[in-house]
Amino acid sequence: MNTLLERIESALIGPEPSVSEREMLQLSQLTLTRRSLTEGMLAIASIGRGKTTLLRTPLRAMLRDGWGGLIPTVKDSMIADMSECICAESRDADLILFDDKAHSVFNPFASITDINEAAALLTGVSEALNKGNHTGSDASFWKQQLQLVLRHLFALCQVQAGKLDLLLAATLFDSRAKTPAELQDPNWRTGNPMWAAIQSARASNDSDAGKAAHYFMETFPHQSGGLQSSLVATVEGVLDQLSREPLRSLFSGESTFSMRDLFDNGKICVVGLPVLSSDSGRIANAILQFCFCREAVKAKRDHHSFLILDEGQELVTTDLMEKMAVIREFKVAVFFLTQNLSVVDQRIGQLAREGLFGLMATRIFGPQNHAATRQWAAEQCGKGQQTAKSTSRSRSNRGSQSSSSETLSSRWDYICPPNQFAQLDIGETIVLRNDEIARVHWHPTHPGRGGSGRII
């Protein structure tokens, strides 16, 4: 009987809407659903012109809806701002503040068993630490060589300890033979951890281990001085940081949470070591962001989650750009906030930035003092037929009488002229989604209630 009533009800009012179509935000005349948010959101405004203000509204909407996620931090103030939003929505029980004071631990190798993935993780960390210093034609070659070193290093870790271990990797690399002559030195071989690992690898039936032993015996010691010096400086720089506090305690031992907690259990991780505070902060944010993106695309999930990238130019990585194309299919919303085009181009280059921004379906333009960014924003909004009014006045020869006339003309021009983005006040934005444009005001003290950007 109940089934019959349900069929009648469905025929009368239509099928139940998809959970992904639940309405979340009303931005003037634009309505954003869960699905809309997972299609990516870009917010771009000059320094101190309201990016964090507008972020509070969509963040609180997602928190209210039970989403979990990751919030990397660039500045100290972001930790307090994001934590305040989480507590305001009564989600403080779900907050994971990842820093040494909170005794948080996240061991990335608790869930990574593949040497290629481990090598990709440390390559991403080195990219963040070096801020993309290797660019141009040699960038891909250098990255390939770096991954080769790390992959062989982790292969030796596996054969020696039966697992991937950062501290062991640091010990092995530090004890490597620097020259072919040192490799043949009996004194170097005696009690040397790297030589012991090479011997274990040569005795095993593991092909990866055998290749790793050959690499550190025949290839690496004979590499050209410039390439070897660059690789050594990079690998040692990353491993040295991870071997010292606070990163040693944060990323080794038994984890207090997992990435699955963020995706499946609604937990929210705020990184308590800002990128700009130290190299430790830059590495901590890079590791968590890498692991979040990798876990995101491993399985389809019932729950929605988010990744907040405020001051995204400091957080963007190659791995993020690769995952952005597919991450929406896994119900993950990415929010990328930045100042202008120039700061992103400086980090990843113009072509990569164009590709990244092209994946953001919703674009929010705030007050902007960078001319090239204003021009770009106007071009994104497009052109259309614009009506212009002109007035002319005339007087008689004696000057006693005057007349005026108005003329309306149509011309093809920007829908939102570049100078319009310079005239916006703090909290005022122009929002572009597909071919729809809305002017939205975000309330600074009552996010989601005041202004025209509201939580549904």
Predicted regions mapped to residue ranges:
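P-loop NTPase motor domains
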Residues: 2-28, 32-332, 411, 416-450, ...
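Conserved ATP-driven motor cores of ASCE-family P-loop NTPases powering translocation/secretion/packaging/pilus
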Residues: 324-433
